[in-house]
Amino acid sequence: MRGMVAQPKQIEVVHTACQQISPLYPDYATRPIKDGFSWSSALAGCAFERLYPVVFRSVRRPDADLELLREHDDRAYQKALESGGLLRYFKGEANEQRECLSFCLWETKEQAIEAAGSASHRSAAAISAQMYESFVLDRYWLEKVVTERGEKLTFEPIRPA
C-alpha cells in the first residue's frame, strides 16, 4: 500500500505541517483545491509519498439549520479523530453565495473509508439533502515527487468506479 510512511516521528511531523495548510485567497471555495491552499509551503520538507484528500463543496440552503449542521459535523469530526489517520480537517465558511469548501486530509484512503462508515458520519451525510442546495464530494491523490529541482506536489482526481 502506497501512502504515508509508517514511522511515528515522520507522521507527527506531517501532521504538524498539515495544520499550517490554509487558504491563500478569499475565494478559495471556488478555486481548484490545488490552487486555493498553501499546500506546497506547509508540506515542504515533509516525508510522504501520497496522501488522500477528500473535498466537500456545497451550496447551503438559505434556511439551513446551522446548529444542527454543526452538531452533526462535530460528531463526525470527533469520530474521525478517534479512528486515526486524519491529518487535517479544514472547515470552510460559506461565502455570500452560500458556497462552501471543506476538506479532510488522510494518511490513507483506507482510513478515510473506515471513518466514512461510522454511524456519526452516516448521520451527518443523511441530513445533506435538507442542508444543501447542491454538494459534491471529490477525492484525490496528493502525491509528492522529489527531483533534482526540488519537490513538486500533484493532485490526481480519483474518478468513481
Regions found by a protein language model. Name each.
Residues 54-58, 89-118:
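Short, well-ordered beta-strand segments in beta-rich or mixed alpha/beta enzyme
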Residues 50, 99-100, 134:
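A structure-centric signal for secondary-structure junctions around beta-strands
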Residues 119-125:
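Compact nucleic-acid interaction/catalytic patches
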Residues 26, 117, 130-133:
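Generic surface-pattern signal
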Residues 125-140:
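Conserved short beta-strand edge segments in small beta-sheet-based binding/regulatory domains
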Residues 1-95, 140-161:
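Short S/T/G/P-rich N-terminal loop/turn motif that feeds into the first structured element of a domain
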